[in-house]
């Protein structure tokens, strides 16, 4: 089969690789550079999504935990285990028993992964590990394990595997129009026909359909997630619960520095993505609420934002499902949603869908 994959983020790269491993002829089109947008602007975590358990997404969490282990086995130089602490305060957003139950369920779903199990740390033990953490009303913290990664380099590793499998990669080649009936894919320089077209363009997937006159049964919410990098080396991560919200913020090791993120803000234009002043203030305020050492804008080493394309939800952004949707229209397969961690599993599902 001759296959065109549109989108050079991690989901596109893994989809192209999956098709090529089955002997298909594959062209991968990317309007810019591989891994240059959403896929390199993540929170740098390979994770099951602990907070998704609150919304009942057990299948997604179980799959993500399995895929987390796959990435580490394949590229241990670019990904590895990381312990994170969730401080528990008296009268906090989530009761100690609730967080503990979530950690135990998370460990159960990760059975066989080889990761250590979560545990409770007393307030004194937390102070040893995070001496800068404020201890007023602190009961202790639950520790649990996930994985950190270098998203950009790990994505390039996957892209190289894709090339080695025989995929032809066309960077800086925007696709202008597609035709689900004929399989035509048109760029500025040419037009070719394919047996299958896979639209896995992430935040730009709907735009491609619109310019091609193709309708879909699904709609995407584009959600901007912003991060800042500040000085300070950490050995462990920390998960902060945001007062008055059900959201969490990560405080993570980032080389010799510390990464804070992420926000969730509606984004209209995928081409104009940058942290807003309000988001930066939000991240700084929530960090300063929990740590003794106050940071200001002058401390920021860098800031970045990415757009998560989430299948539209009737509830709030935090409750929106990160489950992906695969839609078949003739020779066209649209891929909406998805997570970095589960990109390989999503790619396998796309290949299966293409065969029916």
What are these regions (language model features)?
Residues 6, 193-202:
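Short hydrophobic core segments
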Residues 171-184:
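A conserved short coil-to-beta-strand element within the FAD-binding core of flavoproteins
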Residues 217-229, 233-234, 241-259, 266-356:
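C-terminal catalytic lobe of FAD-dependent flavoproteins
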Residues 44-129, 249:
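Dinucleotide-binding Rossmann-like beta1-alpha1 core, especially the glycine-rich loop
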Residues 3-27:
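N-terminal Rossmann-like FAD-binding beta1-loop-alpha1 element of flavoenzymes
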Residues 88-165, 177-180, 255, 293-296, ...:
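Flavin (FAD/FMN) cofactor-binding and adjacent substrate-gating region
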Residues 20-41:
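Glycine-rich FAD pyrophosphate-binding loop
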Residues 199-214:
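Flavin (primarily FAD) binding-site architecture
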């Amino acid at each position: 089969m001759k296959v065109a994959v549109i989108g050079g983020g991690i989901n596109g790269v893994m989809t192209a690789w999956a098709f090529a491993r089955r002997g298909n002829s594959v062209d991968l089109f990317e309007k810019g550079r591989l891994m240059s947008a959403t896929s390199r602007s993540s929170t740098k975590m390979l994770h099951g999504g602990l907070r998704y358990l609150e919304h009942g997404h057990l299948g997604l969490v179980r799959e993500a935990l399995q895929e987390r282990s796959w990435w580490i086995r394949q590229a241990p130089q670019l990904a590895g285990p990381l312990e994170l602490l969730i401080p528990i305060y008296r009268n906090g957003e989530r009761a100690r028993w609730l967080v503990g139950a979530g950690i135990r369920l998370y460990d159960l779903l990760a059975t066989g992964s080889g990761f250590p199990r979560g545990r409770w740390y007393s307030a004194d033990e937390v102070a040893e590990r995070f001496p800068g953490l404020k201890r007023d009303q602190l009961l202790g913290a639950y520790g649990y394990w996930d994985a950190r990664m270098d998203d950009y380099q790990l994505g390039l590793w996957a892209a190289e595997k894709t090339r080695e499998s025989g995929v032809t990669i066309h960077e800086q080649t925007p696709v202008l129009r597609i035709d689900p009936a004929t399989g035509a894919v048109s760029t500025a320089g040419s037009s070719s026909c394919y047996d299958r077209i896979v639209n896995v363009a992430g935040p730009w997937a709907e735009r491609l359909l619109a310019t091609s006159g193709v309708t879909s049964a699904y709609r995407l919410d584009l959600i901007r997630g912003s991060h800042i990098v500040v000085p300070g080396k950490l050995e462990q991560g920390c998960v902060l619960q945001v007062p008055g919200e059900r959201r969490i913020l990560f405080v993570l090791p980032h080389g010799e520095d510390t990464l804070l993120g992420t926000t969730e803000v509606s984004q209209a234009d995928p081409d104009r993505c940058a942290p807003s002043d309000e988001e930066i203030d939000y991240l700084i305020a929530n960090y300063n609420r929990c740590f003794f050492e106050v940071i200001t804008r002058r401390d920021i080493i860098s800031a970045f934002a990415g757009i998560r394309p989430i299948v539209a939800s009737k509830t709030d952004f935090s409750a929106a499902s990160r489950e992906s949707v695969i839609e078949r229209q003739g020779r066209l397969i649209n891929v909406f949603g998805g997570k970095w961690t589960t990109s390989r599993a999503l790619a396998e599902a796309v290949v299966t869908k293409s065969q029916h």
